[in-house]
Design a protein with these regions (language model features):
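A short, structured surface patch at a secondary-structure boundary
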Residues: 75-125, 129-135
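Alpha-helical, coiled-coil/dimerization segments enriched in small aliphatic residues
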Residues: 96-98, 218-247
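Short helix-initiation/N-cap motifs at beta->coil->alpha
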Residues: 57-58, 109-119, 242-251
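Bacterial Sec-exported substrate-binding components of ABC uptake systems
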Residues: 2-9, 22-77, 179-208, 325-335
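C-terminal motif of bacterial Sec signal peptides marking the signal peptidase cleavage site
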Residues: 17-21
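Extracytoplasmic ligand-binding site segments that recognize negatively charged/polar headgroups
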Residues: 138-141, 157-170, 204-225
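Proline-aspartate-enriched helix->loop->beta-strand connector
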Residues: 119-132, 151, 251-264
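Structured C-terminal subdomain patch of bacterial secreted/periplasmic proteins
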Residues: 165-166, 170-173, 179-182, 196, ...
Length: 335
């Protein structure tokens, strides 16, 4: 039977309750490129919604919009951002419901999945603005078909909180909801900055970040959401000195480096399958239990909602969550 170490981070009391174990990652129970010089975007000068808009999207396409009364999104995170800006949707992919927990309503069409969007359903929904991800190949490949169908669309990429702020600011300009940019954008930036200020003079712990799935595990750097946050919090990622880990996670190399912390983010539909892979291929080795991170209960499973999916209005929570693990003595200050 798999054993585990569980630490419960309680934000209100800033305390951690720990159940001891020896081999499997500490499972965090709470669901909850930035620096102090990151983008300090300002809200729209007027609360009146824009009448038309021209901009260059993440793939370099020039986008011209004259209306956005019927907006659809092929990525749940971006659908949520549009709603956070005060917009409404006529269509979204199933991840908006299954992963983001959005209540779309009966009148909102389901447009397939993120990796298999349904072009026929998209056309039937008749959007005047379609929001897509620049990081999903199937969506990138739809550009010509969408153009031929006369569907205005734009590609976005969100790797860090500054990207989220830029997207939210644009959407709030479109909806005329300056107040929501302040509430869901500037307030979030303030939360992040407060955490970064608290940790700026702390030592730099070494970390290994692993993205685990049912058939493998990959070391990740700042090309990953959690990796960006770890970097901003002052952690030194092993992949910066051991780039070979990006191609192949060598247990021998990990043991030799002996990081202070090991973080795991799972992907795929089955978290248990991903953790089974970790158990069979890493934890079963007796040397794994001798790692400093495992010995000191610093082998941690991160919650998907904060470190796999885009946290959107919860970026501040993501930063605080990791900061309190890296620097527990600051937990009360971070809150």
């Amino acid at each position: 039977m798999k054993t585990s170490t569980i630490r419960r981070f309680i934000a209100a009391a800033a305390v951690a309750a720990m159940l001891t174990g020896c081999a499997a990652p500490a499972r965090q129970s709470e669901t909850s490129d930035v620096s102090t010089q990151s983008q300090q975007s300002q809200a729209a000068a007027s609360s009146a919604p824009a009448q038309e808009m021209t901009f260059t999207d993440a793939l370099g396409y020039t986008v011209q919009l004259s209306s956005w009364d019927r907006v659809a999104s092929l990525y749940g995170s971006f659908a949520e951002t549009w709603v956070l800006a005060g917009g409404s949707l006529v269509g979204a992919t199933v991840d908006a419901v299954e992963e983001r927990g959005m209540e779309l309503g009966d009148g909102v069409a389901l447009l397939g999945s993120v990796k298999e969007p349904n072009l026929e359903e998209i056309i039937a929904a008749d959007p005047d603005f379609l929001i897509l991800s620049a990081d999903i190949a199937a969506q990138v490949d739809m550009h010509d078909a969408l153009t031929s169908a006369g569907i205005p669309h734009a590609y976005y990429r969100v790797d860090g909180v500054s990207d989220y702020l830029a997207m939210l600011e644009q959407f709030c300009q479109m909806t005329g909801r300056e107040d929501l940019y302040e509430e869901n954008g500037l307030a979030v930036q303030a939360e992040v900055d407060r955490v970064l200020e608290a940790v700026q003079d702390e030592p730099h712990p070494t970390v290994l970040l692993l993205r685990a799935f049912s058939s493998g595990a990959k070391a990740k750097g700042d090309d990953n959401l959690a990796g960006v946050i770890l970097r901003d919090l002052g952690a030194e990622n092993l992949v910066e000195q051991h780039e070979s880990l990006l191609e192949d996670v060598s247990l021998e190399e990990v043991i030799a480096a002996d990081p202070d912390f090991i973080f795991v983010v799972t992907m795929g539909s089955s978290e248990e399958a991903a953790l089974d892979y970790m158990e069979q291929n890493f934890e079963s080795n007796p040397a794994w239990a001798e790692l400093t991170a495992v010995q000191e209960d610093h082998y941690v499973l991160l919650p998907k909602e904060l470190f796999h999916y885009k946290p959107n209005a919860r970026w501040g929570e993501s930063y605080a969550y990791l900061a309190k693990i890296l620097y527990p003595e600051l937990a009360a200050e971070i809150g």
